[in-house]
Amino acid sequence: MSTQTLERPTPTAASMADNVGEVTEILKLLSAPARLLAVCHLVDGEKSVGALAELTGSKPTTLSQHLALLRAHGLVSTRRDGTTIYYTLASDEIAGLIAYLHKAWCKA
């Protein structure tokens, strides 16, 4: 039986240069502890602002401001149910990044 490895194409200098600004912006957004902690909790699925505030120890109003910034930059998306707003990670790429960070540094 043969095993196949999935090979990712090697990025070119030009493609890396094209994307470095976007990646830098994402890392800046995640450098705030409250925002990083909130998105870490979203890896497990959607959560309301209230649930995230309880999990992170943040005030709901402060956390709402952080989440609004993440939403404006496309890192999270929302769903409204009555007066409750639920947040989820907006892409598989963001979920993968956060899952990697969690696996590498958040060992129990």
Residue map of PLM features:
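Intrinsic low-complexity/disordered segments
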Residues: M1, T62-L63
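Amphipathic alpha-helical dimerization/coiled-coil segments
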Residues: M1-E22, C40, I94-A108
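N-terminal helix-turn-helix DNA-binding core of bacterial DNA-binding proteins
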Residues: A17-T61, D81, I85-D92
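A composition/secondary-structure signal for short, hydrophobic, low-basic-content segments
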Residues: T61-T62, I98
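Residues within the DNA-recognition helix of helix-turn-helix
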Residues: H66
